[in-house]
Amino acid sequence: MIPYKQLSLADIFSDCHEKFENDKPAFLSLLETHIDIDELIPISFRNHFYASTGRTRKYPLQAFLWALIIHRIFSIPTDQLLLTFLAYSKSLREFCGFIKVPDASKITRFKQDFLDDLQLVFDNLVDVTEPICQAIDSAKADMTIFDSSGIEAFVTENNPKYANRIIKQLKAYAKAQGFDKSYDPYKAAYGSMPSHASANPEIKQLYINGHFCYVFKFGIVTNGLGIIRHISFYNKNFMASHPDIVVEKKSDSPDEDKCVHDSKLLIPTLKDFFSKHPLINPKTFLGDAAFDTAQLYKSLLTGDTFGNDKHFSKAYIPLNARSGLENLDYSINEDGIPCCPHDPSLQMKYEGTSKLRSGVTRYKFVCPRMKWIYDKSTQKSHRHCFCDNPCTSSKCGRMVYIYPEKDLRAYPGTIRGTEKWDDTYKIRTVVERDINHIKDNLCLAGRRTQNERTLHADLILAGITQLITVVLADKINHHEYIRSIKPLIA
C-alpha cells in the first residue's frame, strides 16, 4: 500500500518560493547578493528624492538607479527599449523594484532633476573603488591618465551629409580655380563650418577620430588599470568655475585646436579631481603630446598645484614634433637624450640616476664609444674611450650630467627613449579604450537628444556602471572583470 502524504500550504509555498529563486537569472542573483545599492546612495540624494514637498513618489529611488545601471550593463541602446524589457521581464522588474513600469518621461526627468545627486553617487564610488584598485595593482593605480572626447548631440550638423556637402563644394571650387595639391579641402571645410550647432551654442564643433562632429565636450581621468577616477563636463558651469581658461577662436587646423584646448583644460580638471578626493595621491602622469608645454610640466611636477606640496613625480609625455630641444654644447634628440657633439645621430649611453646631498636628482650619460676595461693587476675596472675623434682630453670620454629640475620638459622625472619609458607609456591607451567602451558598450553614443543635462547624466551613469563593475568583480574575486562583466551575463 502506498503511504499517503498530505501536502500542507507551507509545503506548497516553500516549493513555489524555491522555484522562483531558482528561475531567477543567475546574473541578477549575483548583483542582488553582492551589491547593496543603499550603501552607495548619499543621504543627501535620498532626502532630495523623497523631499517632504511635492507628490508622494510612486517609484522608489533604488528602482530608478538599478534600471539605469542595468540599461548600461546589458548595452540596451535606448530608454524605450529598456522599458520594453522591464514590461516583459517580471524578474528584471522585481529586481529593480518596480511594481509598475514607469513612462519614458519619468526616466528623462529623473536624469535631469537629479544630475548633481548622480554625480555624488559617482564620487562616492570612486572612493569605494580606490582601495580595490590599489590591491589589484598599486603601480598602475598610482598613475593618472587624462584624455578628452565628446558626446555627439542629435543635431542637423552631425548628419554626415552636412559635412560631405561642404567638402564636395570646396573640392569643386578648388578644381575650378586650379589650386595645387597643397590645398586641403578638409581643413578648409573645418574653417568654413560654424563653431557651434545652430540649435544650441553649447554644442561645439570638434574633430574626433578623423571626422567632424558637434558635441558636448568632456574629459576623463583614469588610472593605469583603465578605471575612471574623474569626469568633467565642459559646459558653462565648468568654465565659470575656472575663469582662468581663455577660449580662443578656432584656427584652420582641427588637430591644433584640440591640442591647445586640451592643454588648457588639464590643470583645472585635475584640480577638481584632487579637491574631491584628497586621499588619492598618484605620482605618475601620462598624457599625449598635446600636453608638451613648458608651463604644464612646471604645474604638474612642482609646487602646490593640487594641494599643499601635492604634485606628480613623473610625467610621461612625448615631445611635440613641432618643437624640439636645444643645447649650446651638445645636441639633444627627440627623446631628450644628449648626443655626441661630433655626431648628432649617435646618442650617449644612460648610466644611472643619483642624488646629491642636497637631494637634487641628476642623470648621468657617458660617451657611446666608452667601454669598461678590467685591469688584472689591480682587479678593478675603469672606463676607456675608444673614439677616433674624441671631443674631450679625458681618457674616460665625455660625460654629461643632467639636472631634471632645470629643464622639466626635457627630463620630466624620467628618461624618454628607454625601455621603461616605452613600457609605461603604452599604458596610456587605456583611457582611449575606456572612452570607446563607455560610448559603444555603455550606450553613450547614438543618443537621440540634444539636451545637455540628459547627456551629462548619461555620461555620469556610464561611469557609475563601470565602478559598480569593479565592486562586483572584487566581491566575487574575479579581478579580470573589473572593466567589463559581459562574460558573467553569458
What is each model feature region?
Residues 80-95:
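DNA-recognition alpha helix
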Residues 423-490:
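Basic, amphipathic alpha-helical segments enriched in Lys/Arg and hydrophobic/aromatic residues
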Residues 113-285, 289, 294-302, 306-312:
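Polybasic low-complexity intrinsically disordered regions
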Residues 96-113:
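Major-groove recognition helix of helix-turn-helix-like DNA-binding domains
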Residues 255-256, 262-375:
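An internal, acidic/charged active-site-proximal segment
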Residues 1-45, 476-490:
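Charged, often Cys/His-bearing segments associated with DNA-binding zinc-finger transcription factors
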Residues 26-74:
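Basic, short loop/linker segments at the boundary and entry of helix-turn-helix/winged-helix-like folds
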Residues 35, 86-87, 150, 329-366, ...:
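Short amphipathic alpha-helical "interface-anchor" segments enriched in bulky aromatics
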